[in-house]
């Protein structure tokens, strides 16, 4: 089993739809979790940090289930500009640097 697993997609959704991505991780000692967004041929940018059970920011909600070792990202009222690759990132050691493991990413395409 890989350290971090994601469904690669692509998810094709109409504008305004709600879409959810799931990600599982194999190291139960992991302390912190992140969702990054990557636009075509650009550096990934931090979208959301998830430390306890979840986090919410506008149309984006991240949830963490430590017992099942998965995190999810929910995007409500999707917009054309949400089209990107979403990377699930797990810090498998403590500390600020730790050891970040990136998932392969889930591709989202929002259509008008």
PLM regions and their residue ranges:
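Extracellular domains of the immunoglobulin superfamily
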Residues: 1-112
């Amino acid at each position: 089993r890989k350290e971090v697993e994601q469904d690669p997609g692509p998810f094709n959704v109409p504008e305004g739809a709600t879409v959810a991505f799931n990600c599982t991780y194999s190291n139960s000692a992991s302390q912190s979790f992140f969702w990054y967004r990557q636009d075509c041929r650009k550096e990934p940018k931090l979208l959301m940090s998830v430390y306890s059970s979840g986090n919410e920011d506008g149309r984006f909600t991240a949830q963490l289930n430590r017992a099942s070792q998965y995190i999810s990202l929910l995007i409500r009222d999707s917009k054309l500009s949400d089209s990107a690759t979403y990377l699930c990132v797990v810090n498998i050691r403590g500390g600020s640097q730790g050891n970040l493991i990136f998932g392969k990413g889930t591709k989202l395409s929002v259509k008008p």
